Design a protein with these regions (language model features):
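Polar, glycine-rich mid-to-C-terminal structural blocks
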Residues: 383-414, 422, 472, 478-508
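Auxiliary tRNA-acceptor-end handling modules of aminoacyl-tRNA synthetases
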Residues: 43-308, 326, 341-415, 419, ...
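The catalytic-center signature of Zn2+-dependent metalloproteases
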Residues: 340-360, 417-474
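Zn2+-dependent metallopeptidase catalytic core
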Residues: 69, 309-335
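Sec-exported extracytoplasmic/periplasmic mature domains
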Residues: 321-332, 428-429, 433, 469, ...
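Hydrophobic h-region of N-terminal signal peptides that target proteins for export
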Residues: 32-41
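Conserved catalytic/binding loops enriched for acidic/polar residues
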Residues: 440-751
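N-terminal secretory signal peptides that target proteins for export/translocation
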Residues: 1-23
């Protein structure tokens, strides 16, 4: 009996000792962890922010809060210092301080005692189909970018080591954008600083890349480029912005949008527009419904970088703030503001919450505006507007070529007003607006020369057209130079109201239906019409002007004639080469406008539909006469290098235009067109070098068309062969060496 009792006591003590040992082990682990954390806190640099960052002995640790697991974040990359290059292309658009790329949408998740970073590359709105939502989510699996071991836990999150990961140039460098900026493989990279805010973490680094030529992508003689970058990982709002479906009646940049309707098993593919999240605060909803102006919950603020030259700042600020009047049509006051960036630590180019206008030292004669968008809804998160230094050379060229002025000075006030116009156009882009090439066709030719009309109304419906200075104005019209510069117009106001009018309580589909009816009614007026790509629409071309662009092009030619007589004088700002380039560019624009009439179409807006009709016979014949006058006849008065290029290209395009007449019932038939074209070239004199050049070009183009399109367009080929035979018979008795060679050339096609 006593032996049995002793055994029971022995096993009881053994069990207790093992249990005690287990508790002791747990206590030791806790003490060890606490000691590690004390050491971590004591010897580390602590950077608070969206993620708490610990830096110790070259190691970088992040604490990923449990509350942020499953939340979406945006990652953008900004160039803080661009690389100096031995040779940089004049048309290089990217690679300068302030250039921003992205965003990529990332998400942190916890799986199997690991922290997983995933990239969201596609999105389907499943809110309308609860039963299929999880199934669809499985189909749209995010891409796993990185897996992190959990090193420890804090009260609010998990600790991971990001040291090596932050050195990876694929996510934290310029590798994804290498072709845009002309770099090759990365040679070296190091993290230089980490900054934190409650909403973001900014990782700054220095990286060295091999330089490559953009075309072809080969190493540029072993040259290396050094870059300073800032990558901003920013928390996105928990609730997505309400989408607005795209419409063909108004021009907005769009993103693809997949969604499911209630009770449906089918994924519907749509497009939604890019726009800022302008919403009415709950306290202001009643006032907004009554038609009172209210301030949006979150305003659009665009900061001008302090590197921007001081004398141009007022024009840039005005270019932004002028859009406020348009937002008032949408019910918002003070919706957008252009501001000078304060000289404080938080206002940095790599903070993706901030939008910037940056001045860039570059030979590129341009500017651009880029909105950075959450692709899931089209919400514009921020924007970047670049103004290149050499844009003033382009503005000066416009001034000379479109006004015929050749004074020795290009006044700063005029340059500033033109800069304001350029930046206003780019602000329109970062608000989501695309080009509207119908905007310049609003006015009659007489209105374009009426000083009183121009002062009151301007001369276009949209700043989003490629509409430059009013070249229809002649010196005797007495129009002030400030009234020859485009302004924000009626279409721009309509487009902003369409995109930013707030509809409390309505679903996106209801808003779409409401806006469709509204925009169709508005487009009965010319000033509210939209056309994104001109194609063969004479009224919707880049660089054109007026309802009848052939008339205004002839007026514009008057300026160029004066300049051509005065090519040795220039305004001092431009070189002779740039002076000539300005004239050549403008001359080419007028030629291009005439070509759109040949085989062109017009849109006629009605109450129920838009009807497409062919351009009339007289207008097309006028276009032919324009090309005959200003290229085929005037070419001999131009410098040889000009007319050789224009002459050959014009003749080729005239012949190929025959394609546009095939298969359509037109007032001006393909037969009439080819015969009219033949008459023009039969009347070209073969006595001069210029005439012989044109005749030979015309013949070569006809022969090439006959050989390549015989099976495709036999009717057209027969007409062209007829024209060759007519010209052959006319010159059959000519004994000149040129005509002998010409007949021999033609005979080769009939062998």
């Amino acid at each position: 009996m006593s032996m049995l009792l002793n055994k029971q006591l022995f096993f009881r003590d053994l069990f207790r000792s093992r249990k005690m040992l287990s508790w002791l082990k747990k206590i030791c682990w806790i003490l060890f962890f606490l000691l590690c954390m004390i050491k971590l806190y004591a010897q580390s640099e602590v950077i608070p922010g969206l993620f708490t960052t610990y830096q110790q002995n070259g190691r970088i640790l992040w604490v990923i809060p449990d509350s942020l697991l499953g939340r979406d974040m945006s990652l953008t990359t900004t160039i803080l210092e661009g690389a100096g290059r031995k040779k940089k292309s004049a048309d290089a658009k990217f690679g300068y301080q302030g250039d921003r790329f992205g965003p990529r949408i990332l998400r942190w998740e916890e799986e199997k005692e690991q922290i997983i970073l995933k990239e969201i590359r596609s999105y389907v709105d499943t809110s309308g189909s609860y039963s299929l939502g999880s199934l669809l989510a499985e189909r749209e699996m995010p891409l796993t970018l990185q897996e992190f071991e959990i090193l420890g836990c804090e009260k609010t999150g998990k600790i991971i080591d990001v040291t090596e990961w932050l050195r990876d140039g694929k996510l934290w460098g310029l590798q994804p954008f290498s072709f845009l900026i002309g770099i090759g493989s990365e040679r070296e990279g190091r993290v230089t600083a980490i900054l934190g805010t409650p909403e973001s973490v900014i990782v700054r680094s220095e990286r060295i890349y091999e330089a490559v030529e953009r075309t072809p992508a080969t190493s540029a003689n072993g040259e290396v480029t050094r870059w300073k970058l800032g990558c901003c990982l920013r928390l996105l709002p928990r609730h997505l912005m309400q989408v607005r479906y795209a419409s063909s009646g108004v021009g907005y940049f769009t993103v693809p949008y997949a969604h499911m309707e209630p009770g449906s098993c089918q994924v519907i593919s749509d497009r939604v527009v890019k726009r800022w999240r302008l919403e009415v605060a709950d306290r202001d909803t009643a006032r907004y419904r009554r038609g009172e102006l209210v301030e949006p919950r979150q305003k659009i603020r665009i900061y001008i970088d302090r590197s921007f030259p001081e004398k141009w700042r007022p024009y840039v600020l005005r270019a932004v703030n002028n859009w406020n009047a348009l937002f008032e049509r949408s019910g918002f006051k003070n919706a957008i503001a252009g501001l000078m960036a304060p000289d404080s630590a938080g206002f940095t180019l790599d903070n993706s919450a901030l939008s910037w206008i940056v001045y860039k030292a570059s030979p590129m004669e341009n500017a651009y505006g880029r909105p950075f968008v959450d692709f899931r809804t089209g919400e514009i998160l921020s924007c970047h507007i670049a103004v290149f230094h050499s844009v003033f050379d382009m503005l000066c060229q416009w001034y000379i070529a479109q006004t015929g002025e050749s004074e020795e000075e290009f006044p700063d006030e005029l340059a500033g007003r033109l800069l304001e116009m350029v930046v206003s156009h780019e602000v329109g882009h970062v608000l989501g607006l695309t080009h509207n090439f119908y905007g310049s066709s609003l006015c009659e030719t007489e209105q374009l020369r009426d000083a009183v009309f121009l002062h009151r109304h301007g001369y276009g419906s949209s700043i989003m057209d490629y509409m430059r200075m009013n070249y229809a104005v002649q010196p005797e019209d007495g129009v002030d130079m400030s009234d020859r510069i485009p302004r924000i117009g009626a279409y721009d106001s309509l487009a902003i109201e369409w995109g930013y009018r707030y509809f409390p309580g309505l679903a996106s589909e209801e808003i779409q239906e409401k806006l469709s009816v509204w925009i169709e009614k508005k487009q009965l007026e010319r000033k509210y019409r939209f056309q994104d790509s001109g194609g063969n629409l004479p009224e919707a071309q880049a660089e054109d002007l007026g309802r009848y662009s052939l008339e205004t092009a002839e007026l514009g030619m008057c300026h160029l004639k004066r300049l051509l007589r005065d090519t040795l004088r220039n305004n001092g700002r431009l070189s002779v080469e740039s002076w000539n380039l300005a004239i050549r560019k403008q001359y080419s624009e007028y030629i291009n406008q005439a070509f759109t009439y040949l085989g062109g179409i017009r849109k006629c807006w009605g109450n129920d539909s838009v009807i497409v009709v062919a351009v009339g016979r007289e207008e097309q014949q006028d276009a032919l006469r324009f090309l005959q006058t200003y290229v085929l006849e005037s070419g001999k008065d131009l410098p040889r290098e000009w007319w050789e290029g224009w002459g050959r290209e014009t003749v080729r395009r005239l012949v190929e235009k025959a394609d546009c007449f095939v298969g359509y019932d037109r007032e001006y038939s393909v037969t009439e067109y080819i015969r009219d074209l033949g008459k023009i070239f039969r009347n070209v004199s073969g006595e001069e070098c210029w005439g012989r050049f044109l005749i030979w070009c015309y013949t070569d183009c006809l022969m090439e068309y006959i050989q390549t399109e015989r099976n495709r367009y036999p009717e057209v080929v027969a007409l062209m062969e007829e024209q060759l035979k007519v010209m052959y018979r006319k010159t059959d008795k000519e004994k000149d060496v040129f005509w002998k060679a010409w007949r021999k050339n033609v005979n080769s096609i009939w062998k």
